[in-house]
Amino acid sequence: MKLRTVAAAMLALALSAGAAAAQPAKSLRDQIVGTWNFVVAEVTAPDGKKSYPFGETPKGILIFTPDGRFAQIHVAGDVPKIASNNRLTGTPEEYAAIMRRSLSVFGTYAVDEEKKTVTYNIVSATFPNWEGEAQTRTIDKLTEDEFVNTNAGIAGGRGSASNFYKRVK
């Protein structure tokens, strides 16, 4: 009797493994949907020098919804607090430091499966010059846990910028 139970269990396992293998691979778009923690942004200058515009310990999040919307917040880990404790009464220096060390953007997105790119159609951003733009990033890595994308042509020919994320679990 035990032998039959073990044999039946092994057969069931083999069949379920075969069924799982027969399922089609998830599209890049399906894989990208979810919530991602921002790990770091790395800018590589044309001479190969690397810099980190949000520092090496930033905070942030990137959210892709199934219906094609995204929201992104990147903040340096060392953004100074406003001394007055009132966001409307900071000094020009405090506001400048915050603007240089943070970025929020939202809109819609599209994934090109063949080119392995994601295009952000920006509705609004804390850098208002981007509003209405479509910005395309190369998907360099996309696993269950990690997502890396690169903007190959950042403003002023300063090189490329890669953003690294880990999936929120």
Predicted regions and their residues:
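Lipid interaction determinants
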Residues: A8-M10, G18-K169
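Positively charged n-region of N-terminal signal peptides that target proteins for export
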Residues: M1-T5
